[in-house]
Amino acid sequence: MTHVFDIFQERRLSVGKIDNNKQMKRESLLDSAFSLFINNGFSKTSISDIVNNAGVAKGTFYLYFKDKYDIRNHLIAHKASQVFQAAYSDLLRHPDIHDFEEQVLFITDNILDQFAANHSLVTLISKHLSWGFFKNSLTFAPFADTPAIYTIYESLLSHAAYTYRSPELMFYMILELVSGTSYNAILYQQPVPLEELKPELYAAICGIFKQFRIRKKRK
C-alpha cells in the first residue's frame, strides 16, 4: 500500500511540475509580448518576435494563443488582474477598512497609484478597454487559488452596510468614470494632475454609491 501511495505521490508531483512549466512558458510569452508591444508597438511586433524574445519555440505560442490579437487580449486581462490583485492584497493589510464603499475607494486609489508609477500599464490597458472586453477580464482567474476581480467585488459587496440596486451597473459606472477621467491626468497632467483629480473623482464615486443605495442592512 505504501509503495502504491509513493507512486501516486510521484505522479502527482510530476503532473504538478509539468503544469508549473506550462504556466512559466505562458507567463514568459505574456511578459515578452508586453515588453515588445510597449517598446515597438503592437503593429510592428510579430509572433516570431514574441517567441524569440521569450526563448521558446513558435509552436509553443499556439499551445496558448490563437494569434497576436488573442495574446494581446489575454495580456490585458492578465495585467488588469495583476493590478487589481495587488490593490486587494494591500487592502487585506488594512483590516480597519471594513466598510464596502471605503474599500472600493481604497482599491481605486491603489490602482491609480500603480498606474501613475507605470505609464506603460496605462497605455496598454486603457487604450483597449471596452465594457464587453473588460467584463470578460473581470471573471478571469489567473490561478486556481486566485479569485477573479468580480468575485472579489461580490464578496466585498456581500458585507456592505447597504444593499444596492443593479450592482453590476454600479460597478460599470465607477469603472468608466475612473478610466475615463484618469487617463489624461496620469499621462499628461491634463486637465489637472492626478493628485488634484483624486478628491473630485472620489466625491463623484461616493455620489454613485448614494444613487444606487436601496436601504441600510439590519445588523
Task: Describe the role of every protein-language-model region.
Residues 72-82, 86, 125, 145:
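Alpha-helical DNA-contacting segments of helix-turn-helix folds
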Residues 123, 158-204, 215-219:
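Hydrophobic/aromatic-rich alpha-helical bundle segments in the mid-to-C-terminal region
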Residues 133-161, 168-172, 199, 206:
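Amphipathic alpha-helical packing segments from all-alpha helical-bundle domains
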